Amino acid sequence: MPEILDQARTQVLENGVGLDEAGVLAVLNLPDEHLPAALQLAHEVRMRWCGPEVEVEGIVSLKTGGCPEDCHFCSQSGLFTSPVRAVWLDIPSLVEAAKQTAKTGATEFCIVAAVRGPDDRLMRQLREGVAAIQAEVDIQVAASVGMLTQEQVDELVEMGVHRYNHNLETCRSYFPNVVTTHSWEERWETLRMVRESGMEVCCGGILGLGESVEQRAEFAAQLAELDPHEVPLNFLNPRPGTPLGDRSVVEGKDALRAIAAFRLAMPRTILRYAGGRELTLGDLGTRSGLLGGINAVIVGNYLTTLGRPATTDLELLEDLKMPVKALSATL
Protein backbone atom coordinates (compact mmCIF):
# COMPACT_ATOMS: atom_id res chain seq x y z
CA MET A 1 0.00 0.00 0.00
CA PRO A 2 1.47 3.42 -0.94
CA GLU A 3 2.46 5.58 2.00
CA ILE A 4 0.01 8.35 1.04
CA LEU A 5 -2.93 5.95 1.29
CA ASP A 6 -1.77 4.70 4.68
CA GLN A 7 -1.51 8.32 5.80
CA ALA A 8 -4.96 9.12 4.40
CA ARG A 9 -6.55 6.15 6.14
CA THR A 10 -5.50 7.54 9.50
CA GLN A 11 -5.75 11.27 8.80
CA VAL A 12 -8.86 11.40 6.62
CA LEU A 13 -10.89 8.26 7.28
CA GLU A 14 -10.33 8.01 11.01
CA ASN A 15 -9.89 11.68 11.94
CA GLY A 16 -11.78 13.54 9.21
CA VAL A 17 -8.88 15.84 8.33
CA GLY A 18 -8.41 16.34 4.59
CA LEU A 19 -5.14 15.90 2.74
CA ASP A 20 -3.11 19.03 2.02
CA GLU A 21 -1.85 20.03 -1.43
CA ALA A 22 1.18 17.73 -1.25
CA GLY A 23 -1.00 14.81 -0.21
CA VAL A 24 -3.46 15.44 -3.03
CA LEU A 25 -0.59 15.58 -5.52
CA ALA A 26 0.68 12.23 -4.25
CA VAL A 27 -2.74 10.68 -4.87
CA LEU A 28 -2.95 12.24 -8.34
CA ASN A 29 0.43 10.71 -9.15
CA LEU A 30 -0.43 7.18 -7.98
CA PRO A 31 0.33 4.46 -10.54
CA ASP A 32 -2.64 2.75 -12.16
CA GLU A 33 -2.23 -0.38 -10.05
CA HIS A 34 -3.02 1.60 -6.90
CA LEU A 35 -6.06 3.41 -8.32
CA PRO A 36 -8.58 0.79 -7.07
CA ALA A 37 -7.21 1.14 -3.53
CA ALA A 38 -7.45 4.93 -3.72
CA LEU A 39 -11.05 4.75 -4.93
CA GLN A 40 -11.96 2.24 -2.23
CA LEU A 41 -10.49 4.47 0.47
CA ALA A 42 -12.26 7.53 -0.95
CA HIS A 43 -15.54 5.60 -0.87
CA GLU A 44 -14.98 4.63 2.75
CA VAL A 45 -14.28 8.29 3.57
CA ARG A 46 -17.47 9.38 1.83
CA MET A 47 -19.51 6.75 3.71
CA ARG A 48 -17.92 7.62 7.06
CA TRP A 49 -18.24 11.41 6.86
CA CYS A 50 -21.18 11.95 4.45
CA GLY A 51 -23.23 8.78 4.66
CA PRO A 52 -24.75 6.61 1.93
CA GLU A 53 -27.26 9.09 0.50
CA VAL A 54 -26.78 10.69 -2.91
CA GLU A 55 -28.07 14.20 -3.63
CA VAL A 56 -29.77 14.59 -7.01
CA GLU A 57 -30.05 17.96 -8.78
CA GLY A 58 -31.44 19.32 -12.02
CA ILE A 59 -30.32 22.54 -13.70
CA VAL A 60 -31.90 24.89 -16.24
CA SER A 61 -30.69 28.00 -18.02
CA LEU A 62 -32.82 31.11 -17.47
CA LYS A 63 -30.58 33.02 -19.89
CA THR A 64 -28.49 31.11 -22.41
CA GLY A 65 -25.65 32.57 -24.50
CA GLY A 66 -24.58 36.13 -25.17
CA CYS A 67 -22.23 36.32 -22.18
CA PRO A 68 -19.65 39.15 -22.41
CA GLU A 69 -16.92 37.14 -20.65
CA ASP A 70 -14.23 35.13 -22.45
CA CYS A 71 -14.09 31.87 -20.46
CA HIS A 72 -12.20 29.82 -23.05
CA PHE A 73 -14.12 26.60 -22.41
CA CYS A 74 -17.61 28.10 -22.68
CA SER A 75 -19.81 28.09 -25.77
CA GLN A 76 -22.09 30.69 -24.16
CA SER A 77 -19.54 33.48 -24.58
CA GLY A 78 -20.67 36.08 -27.08
CA LEU A 79 -17.03 36.60 -28.06
CA PHE A 80 -16.59 33.22 -29.78
CA THR A 81 -18.03 31.69 -32.94
CA SER A 82 -19.98 28.93 -31.21
CA PRO A 83 -23.51 28.09 -32.41
CA VAL A 84 -25.11 29.08 -29.08
CA ARG A 85 -27.28 32.20 -29.29
CA ALA A 86 -28.79 34.37 -26.55
CA VAL A 87 -32.18 33.07 -25.38
CA TRP A 88 -34.33 33.84 -22.32
CA LEU A 89 -36.57 31.21 -20.72
CA ASP A 90 -40.05 32.35 -19.71
CA ILE A 91 -41.36 31.79 -16.18
CA PRO A 92 -43.96 29.09 -17.05
CA SER A 93 -41.24 27.08 -18.80
CA LEU A 94 -38.96 27.53 -15.79
CA VAL A 95 -41.65 26.20 -13.45
CA GLU A 96 -42.36 23.28 -15.75
CA ALA A 97 -38.64 22.41 -15.79
CA ALA A 98 -38.63 22.46 -11.98
CA LYS A 99 -41.67 20.15 -11.91
CA GLN A 100 -40.01 17.69 -14.28
CA THR A 101 -36.84 17.80 -12.21
CA ALA A 102 -38.79 17.09 -9.01
CA LYS A 103 -40.43 14.07 -10.66
CA THR A 104 -37.00 12.44 -11.01
CA GLY A 105 -36.59 12.54 -7.23
CA ALA A 106 -34.20 15.49 -7.33
CA THR A 107 -34.06 17.61 -4.19
CA GLU A 108 -32.52 20.70 -5.79
CA PHE A 109 -33.21 22.79 -8.88
CA CYS A 110 -30.56 25.29 -9.94
CA ILE A 111 -31.38 28.34 -12.06
CA VAL A 112 -28.40 29.39 -14.17
CA ALA A 113 -27.72 32.43 -16.35
CA ALA A 114 -24.85 33.12 -18.74
CA VAL A 115 -23.80 36.55 -17.48
CA ARG A 116 -20.87 38.31 -15.85
CA GLY A 117 -23.29 39.24 -13.11
CA PRO A 118 -27.03 39.91 -12.92
CA ASP A 119 -28.57 43.21 -14.05
CA ASP A 120 -31.93 44.52 -12.82
CA ARG A 121 -33.86 42.59 -15.49
CA LEU A 122 -32.27 39.30 -14.53
CA MET A 123 -32.83 39.89 -10.82
CA ARG A 124 -36.53 40.57 -11.51
CA GLN A 125 -36.80 37.41 -13.60
CA LEU A 126 -35.03 35.43 -10.92
CA ARG A 127 -37.31 36.77 -8.19
CA GLU A 128 -40.42 35.92 -10.22
CA GLY A 129 -39.07 32.50 -11.12
CA VAL A 130 -38.07 31.52 -7.59
CA ALA A 131 -41.42 32.65 -6.20
CA ALA A 132 -43.33 30.74 -8.88
CA ILE A 133 -41.34 27.56 -8.27
CA GLN A 134 -41.73 27.80 -4.50
CA ALA A 135 -45.49 28.19 -4.93
CA GLU A 136 -45.89 25.07 -7.07
CA VAL A 137 -42.97 22.69 -6.59
CA ASP A 138 -41.60 20.94 -3.50
CA ILE A 139 -37.92 21.43 -4.27
CA GLN A 140 -34.99 23.49 -3.03
CA VAL A 141 -33.99 26.36 -5.34
CA ALA A 142 -30.34 27.22 -6.01
CA ALA A 143 -28.95 29.89 -8.32
CA SER A 144 -25.87 30.55 -10.43
CA VAL A 145 -25.90 33.99 -12.03
CA GLY A 146 -22.29 35.14 -11.94
CA MET A 147 -20.48 37.64 -9.77
CA LEU A 148 -22.61 39.49 -7.24
CA THR A 149 -22.74 42.72 -5.28
CA GLN A 150 -23.56 42.65 -1.59
CA GLU A 151 -27.03 44.02 -2.36
CA GLN A 152 -27.67 41.19 -4.81
CA VAL A 153 -26.49 38.61 -2.28
CA ASP A 154 -28.97 40.02 0.22
CA GLU A 155 -31.75 39.89 -2.40
CA LEU A 156 -31.09 36.22 -3.10
CA VAL A 157 -31.28 35.44 0.60
CA GLU A 158 -34.59 37.30 0.78
CA MET A 159 -35.92 35.30 -2.19
CA GLY A 160 -35.22 32.05 -0.37
CA VAL A 161 -32.35 30.82 -2.55
CA HIS A 162 -30.68 28.25 -0.32
CA ARG A 163 -27.47 27.56 -2.25
CA TYR A 164 -25.39 29.63 -4.64
CA ASN A 165 -23.10 28.18 -7.28
CA HIS A 166 -20.10 30.14 -8.48
CA ASN A 167 -17.25 28.02 -9.77
CA LEU A 168 -13.62 29.05 -9.47
CA GLU A 169 -13.14 26.79 -12.54
CA THR A 170 -9.44 26.12 -11.96
CA CYS A 171 -6.60 27.00 -9.61
CA ARG A 172 -5.50 30.57 -9.04
CA SER A 173 -2.19 30.16 -10.88
CA TYR A 174 -3.81 28.77 -14.06
CA PHE A 175 -6.95 30.93 -14.18
CA PRO A 176 -5.45 33.71 -16.38
CA ASN A 177 -4.87 31.09 -19.08
CA VAL A 178 -8.59 30.41 -19.44
CA VAL A 179 -10.26 33.73 -18.49
CA THR A 180 -8.96 37.26 -19.12
CA THR A 181 -12.08 39.44 -18.71
CA HIS A 182 -12.21 39.05 -14.93
CA SER A 183 -10.00 37.67 -12.18
CA TRP A 184 -9.99 34.63 -9.93
CA GLU A 185 -10.01 37.04 -6.99
CA GLU A 186 -13.29 38.59 -8.17
CA ARG A 187 -14.90 35.17 -8.11
CA TRP A 188 -13.47 34.49 -4.65
CA GLU A 189 -14.98 37.76 -3.36
CA THR A 190 -18.47 36.72 -4.49
CA LEU A 191 -18.01 33.40 -2.72
CA ARG A 192 -16.93 35.20 0.46
CA MET A 193 -20.09 37.33 0.46
CA VAL A 194 -22.29 34.31 -0.22
CA ARG A 195 -20.77 32.40 2.67
CA GLU A 196 -21.19 35.31 5.07
CA SER A 197 -24.85 35.66 4.02
CA GLY A 198 -25.71 32.20 5.28
CA MET A 199 -26.45 30.70 1.87
CA GLU A 200 -24.74 27.40 1.18
CA VAL A 201 -21.70 27.73 -1.09
CA CYS A 202 -21.40 25.54 -4.18
CA CYS A 203 -18.03 25.90 -5.89
CA GLY A 204 -16.07 23.62 -8.17
CA GLY A 205 -14.57 23.70 -11.60
CA ILE A 206 -13.49 21.93 -14.75
CA LEU A 207 -10.63 19.48 -15.10
CA GLY A 208 -8.84 19.17 -18.42
CA LEU A 209 -8.43 22.85 -19.28
CA GLY A 210 -4.69 22.34 -19.83
CA GLU A 211 -3.69 22.59 -16.19
CA SER A 212 -0.82 20.47 -14.87
CA VAL A 213 -1.23 17.73 -12.27
CA GLU A 214 0.41 20.10 -9.78
CA GLN A 215 -2.21 22.72 -10.59
CA ARG A 216 -5.01 20.21 -10.04
CA ALA A 217 -3.59 19.63 -6.57
CA GLU A 218 -3.40 23.40 -6.05
CA PHE A 219 -7.05 23.70 -7.07
CA ALA A 220 -8.15 20.98 -4.64
CA ALA A 221 -6.28 22.71 -1.82
CA GLN A 222 -7.87 26.07 -2.65
CA LEU A 223 -11.33 24.53 -2.68
CA ALA A 224 -10.61 22.87 0.66
CA GLU A 225 -9.61 26.26 2.06
CA LEU A 226 -12.94 27.69 0.87
CA ASP A 227 -14.71 24.68 2.43
CA PRO A 228 -17.85 24.80 0.25
CA HIS A 229 -20.95 22.80 1.03
CA GLU A 230 -20.75 21.30 -2.45
CA VAL A 231 -18.07 20.84 -5.13
CA PRO A 232 -19.28 20.06 -8.67
CA LEU A 233 -16.58 18.32 -10.69
CA ASN A 234 -16.78 18.92 -14.44
CA PHE A 235 -14.54 17.36 -17.08
CA LEU A 236 -13.92 19.40 -20.20
CA ASN A 237 -16.26 18.59 -23.06
CA PRO A 238 -14.56 20.63 -25.81
CA ARG A 239 -17.07 22.91 -27.51
CA PRO A 240 -16.76 23.88 -31.18
CA GLY A 241 -15.85 27.50 -31.75
CA THR A 242 -14.23 28.03 -28.35
CA PRO A 243 -10.46 28.46 -27.76
CA LEU A 244 -10.40 25.05 -26.04
CA GLY A 245 -12.54 23.38 -28.68
CA ASP A 246 -9.70 21.18 -29.95
CA ARG A 247 -8.39 19.95 -26.59
CA SER A 248 -8.34 16.25 -25.80
CA VAL A 249 -10.69 15.01 -23.10
CA VAL A 250 -9.40 13.88 -19.71
CA GLU A 251 -8.39 10.22 -19.60
CA GLY A 252 -10.84 8.14 -17.58
CA LYS A 253 -8.23 6.92 -15.09
CA ASP A 254 -7.02 10.47 -14.51
CA ALA A 255 -10.60 11.57 -13.87
CA LEU A 256 -11.06 8.78 -11.31
CA ARG A 257 -7.75 9.67 -9.64
CA ALA A 258 -9.00 13.25 -9.35
CA ILE A 259 -12.30 12.12 -7.83
CA ALA A 260 -10.48 10.11 -5.18
CA ALA A 261 -8.00 12.91 -4.51
CA PHE A 262 -10.67 15.62 -4.16
CA ARG A 263 -12.66 13.41 -1.78
CA LEU A 264 -9.57 12.81 0.34
CA ALA A 265 -8.98 16.58 0.43
CA MET A 266 -12.60 17.34 1.43
CA PRO A 267 -14.04 14.42 3.40
CA ARG A 268 -17.30 16.14 4.43
CA THR A 269 -18.15 17.99 1.20
CA ILE A 270 -20.86 17.03 -1.28
CA LEU A 271 -18.82 15.97 -4.33
CA ARG A 272 -21.06 16.15 -7.37
CA TYR A 273 -20.74 14.64 -10.82
CA ALA A 274 -21.33 17.50 -13.26
CA GLY A 275 -20.65 18.05 -16.97
CA GLY A 276 -18.40 15.93 -19.14
CA ARG A 277 -18.56 12.65 -17.21
CA GLU A 278 -20.45 10.95 -20.04
CA LEU A 279 -17.60 11.69 -22.44
CA THR A 280 -14.72 11.11 -20.03
CA LEU A 281 -15.96 8.16 -17.98
CA GLY A 282 -18.87 6.48 -19.75
CA ASP A 283 -21.15 4.09 -17.88
CA LEU A 284 -18.46 1.97 -16.21
CA GLY A 285 -16.42 4.97 -15.10
CA THR A 286 -19.52 6.71 -13.76
CA ARG A 287 -20.18 3.67 -11.58
CA SER A 288 -16.54 3.64 -10.42
CA GLY A 289 -16.75 7.29 -9.37
CA LEU A 290 -19.89 6.66 -7.33
CA LEU A 291 -17.93 3.92 -5.59
CA GLY A 292 -14.90 6.22 -5.28
CA GLY A 293 -16.03 9.36 -3.48
CA ILE A 294 -18.86 10.94 -5.51
CA ASN A 295 -22.10 11.46 -3.55
CA ALA A 296 -24.19 13.74 -5.77
CA VAL A 297 -25.20 13.92 -9.43
CA ILE A 298 -26.74 16.35 -11.88
CA VAL A 299 -29.43 14.44 -13.76
CA GLY A 300 -30.60 15.11 -17.30
CA ASN A 301 -29.00 17.60 -19.64
CA TYR A 302 -26.54 20.37 -18.81
CA LEU A 303 -26.59 23.96 -20.04
CA THR A 304 -25.37 23.46 -23.61
CA THR A 305 -24.47 19.75 -23.70
CA LEU A 306 -26.44 16.53 -23.41
CA GLY A 307 -26.24 14.48 -20.23
CA ARG A 308 -27.45 10.99 -19.38
CA PRO A 309 -31.20 10.37 -19.05
CA ALA A 310 -32.29 10.88 -15.44
CA THR A 311 -33.70 7.36 -15.36
CA THR A 312 -30.28 5.93 -16.23
CA ASP A 313 -28.62 7.58 -13.24
CA LEU A 314 -31.49 6.74 -10.90
CA GLU A 315 -31.40 3.09 -11.98
CA LEU A 316 -27.65 3.04 -11.36
CA LEU A 317 -28.12 4.45 -7.85
CA GLU A 318 -30.77 1.82 -7.16
CA ASP A 319 -28.47 -0.91 -8.46
CA LEU A 320 -25.68 0.34 -6.17
CA LYS A 321 -28.13 0.47 -3.22
CA MET A 322 -27.44 4.20 -2.79
CA PRO A 323 -30.55 6.02 -1.53
CA VAL A 324 -31.48 9.39 -3.01
CA LYS A 325 -31.32 12.06 -0.33
CA ALA A 326 -34.83 13.03 0.77
CA LEU A 327 -35.92 16.65 0.46
CA SER A 328 -36.74 16.86 4.15
CA ALA A 329 -33.14 16.00 4.96
CA THR A 330 -31.89 19.11 3.15
CA LEU A 331 -34.23 21.68 4.69
UniProtKB/Swiss-Prot annotation:
The organism of origin for this protein: Salinispora tropica (strain ATCC BAA-916 / DSM 44818 / JCM 13857 / NBRC 105044 / CNB-440)
Cofactor note: Binds 1 [4Fe-4S] cluster. The cluster is coordinated with 3 cysteines and an exchangeable S-adenosyl-L-methionine. Binds 1 [2Fe-2S] cluster. The cluster is coordinated with 3 cysteines and 1 arginine.
Binding site for [2Fe-2S] cluster: 110, 202, 272
Domain Radical SAM core as annotated: residue spans: 52-277
Known partners and oligomeric status: Homodimer.
GO MF: 2 iron, 2 sulfur cluster binding; 4 iron, 4 sulfur cluster binding; biotin synthase activity; iron ion binding
Pathway it works in: Cofactor biosynthesis; biotin biosynthesis; biotin from 7,8-diaminononanoate: step 2/2
Protein name: Biotin synthase
Cofactors, names only: [4Fe-4S] cluster; [2Fe-2S] cluster
Residues at which [4Fe-4S] cluster binds: 67, 71, 74
Family per record: Belongs to the radical SAM superfamily. Biotin synthase family.
Function noted in UniProt: Catalyzes the conversion of dethiobiotin (DTB) to biotin by the insertion of a sulfur atom into dethiobiotin via a radical-based mechanism.
